[in-house]
Structures are given as structure tokens and as C-alpha cells.
């Protein structure tokens, strides 16, 4: 009788534990930054994975140092109010938007430009507009001039110009700072709408398999945020890379394997 009682107690504890774990997963999947991480670099890698330095170690560390808003922060529209589909957001980045035109491609250019500006590489801040003309920044260390440059850039650049300007990268060679981008329109009229997301961190296991974090903005303009991976059973933000995949579903957006780009 005592043995049966012990078994029942053990089973009851297991059920309670499983229910608690399930509740933790459910709550975590609906709450932004559930563990209150301070920066992107604080987000733990998947088990068995280690962060890579990347070809530009300073750029990798800059992206990992980007601050996150606290637990439960909503993705807010630039014009005010909560954006739709909050569950797509894993953590909100603590970077105020500069204008209502700062959308997906603009966010990718913004993060790249912020790195160059904050490290004093002013002469390397240059992007092309939709007509292929290079727009170079020449305001030096002036934050006001830098932000004015970006606001002007947002009005004349897009996923189309970004995809043409950046160079292709093989998935197996993915680096922090790379961008998945498909253009809103190309010469053949493909894609009514475009989208771009930035790889803000990359980790690798001993077998060379990569995992990565993505950040995005969207239309209408909203807070930059780390994306949640709904295919991950733990609702983790880490995406896993299949080098042989022809099509990648990143959150709700599909990308072809040849749509990974780098600056």
C-alpha cells in the first residue's frame, strides 16, 4: 500500500511539473523578453552552440551590445498605439525610431549606419537610392546631421535598392550583420511587397551547423524587435539553418536561399 502511495505521489508530482512547464512555455511564448535580458548578447545560445566572431568581430559585438527593453514591452507604432501581431516579437530593442518612414529595409540600413557612426567610420556611411545613386554621409560626428541624413535616406531607399546594393552570401557562410531581403519589385515585376530582416547574431555547434537571431522593422513603422521563431518548440528566438534548403520560412516570411546579402 505504501509503495502504491509513493508511486501515485511521484506521478502527481510529474503531472504538476509537466503542467508547470507547459504553462511556462505558453506564457513565455506570449510575453516579450520573458527573462528580462538586457542586450542581444545576453540571450543564451541553443545548447551545444557558441557565438561566432564573424569576419568583422567589432560589428558582431556591436550588434550583440544593442539594448533590449524590459519584460513585457510591446512593439509600438511610430504614430502611437500597439502594433498588431505582438506574438511575433521576442524582445523589443531600445532604439527610438527617427521617422514614420523607418520600416524594414530602413532598419537594416539604420543598424549598419549606427555601427559605423558610433565607431567613427563616417566615410563608410553610404547607401544607394532606388535609382542607383550613392548617397554619402558627410556630417562627421554630429548626431543631428547623422539623423537628418538617415531621415532623407528613408524616403529614397527601399528593399529594391538594398537588394541591389548588397552582395550575395552563401547560407553556410552567414555572418552577424547579414540581411535576408527580397525586393518589392524587380525588373520582372516579382513581389508586390518586399521585406528585409537583419541577422543580429550567429552561433555554431561543433558540427558547423548554424543558428541565428533576426531583427526587423515593418510597415507601418514600428519598434525594432528580435523575431520569435514559432517553429522552435520552446518559442526561442533562435532559427536553425539548413544549408541545403531552397526556401526558408523565417517567422511568417519566406526567403529563397539566395536572398541572403551582406554589406
Residue spans of the language-model regions?
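Hydrophobic alpha-helical membrane-insertion segments, chiefly the h-region
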Residues: 16-24
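Low-complexity, Gly/Ser/Thr/Pro-rich intrinsically disordered linker/tail segments
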Residues: 211-263
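N-terminal Sec-pathway targeting helices
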Residues: 1-15
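...with weaker cross-activation on analogous glycine-rich loops/strands in unrelated enzymes
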Residues: 144-210
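N-terminal hydrophobic targeting/anchoring segments and the immediately downstream early-domain regions
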Residues: 86-90
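N-terminal module-boundary/linker segments of secreted carbohydrate-active enzymes
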Residues: 24-85, 98
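Extracellular-facing segments of soluble proteins and assemblies that are Gly/Ser/Thr-biased and enriched
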Residues: 94-173
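Short loop/turn segments at secondary-structure transitions that flank enzyme active sites
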Residues: 114, 203-205, 220
Amino acid at each position: 500500500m505504501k509503495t502504491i502511495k509513493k508511486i501515485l505521489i511521484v506521478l502527481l508530482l510529474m503531472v504538476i511539473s509537466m503542467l508547470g512547464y507547459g504553462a511556462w512555455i505558453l506564457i513565455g511564448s506570449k510575453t516579450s523578453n520573458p527573462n528580462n535580458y538586457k542586450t542581444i548578447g545576453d540571450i543564451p545560445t541553443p545548447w551545444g552552440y557558441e557565438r561566432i566572431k564573424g569576419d568583422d568581430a567589432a560589428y558582431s559585438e556591436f550588434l550583440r551590445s544593442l539594448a533590449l527593453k524590459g519584460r513585457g514591452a510591446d512593439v509600438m507604432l511610430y504614430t502611437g498605439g500597439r502594433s498588431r501581431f505582438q506574438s511575433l516579437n521576442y524582445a523589443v530593442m531600445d532604439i527610438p525610431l527617427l521617422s514614420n518612414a523607418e520600416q524594414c529595409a530602413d532598419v537594416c540600413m539604420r543598424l549598419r549606419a549606427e555601427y559605423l557612426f558610433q565607431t567613427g567610420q563616417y566615410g563608410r556611411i553610404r547607401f544607394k537610392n532606388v535609382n542607383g545613386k550613392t548617397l554619402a554621409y558627410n556630417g562627421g560626428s554630429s548626431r543631428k546631421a547623422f539623423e537628418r541624413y538617415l531621415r532623407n535616406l528613408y524616403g529614397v531607399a527601399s528593399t529594391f535598392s538594398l537588394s541591389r546594393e548588397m552582395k550575395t552570401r552563401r547560407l553556410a557562410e552567414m555572418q552577424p550583420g547579414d540581411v535576408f531581403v527580397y525586393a518589392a519589385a524587380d525588373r520582372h515585376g516579382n513581389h508586390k511587397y518586399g521585406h528585409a530582416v537583419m541577422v543580429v547574431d550567429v552561433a555554431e555547434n561543433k558540427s558547423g551547423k548554424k543558428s541565428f537571431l533576426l531583427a526587423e522593422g515593418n510597415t507601418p513603422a514600428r519598434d525594432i524587435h528580435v523575431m520569435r521563431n514559432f517553429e522552435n518548440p520552446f518559442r526561442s528566438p533562435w532559427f536553425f539553418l539548413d544549408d541545403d534548403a531552397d526556401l526558408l520560412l523565417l517567422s511568417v516570411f519566406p526567403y529563397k536561399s539566395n536572398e541572403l546579402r551582406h554589406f
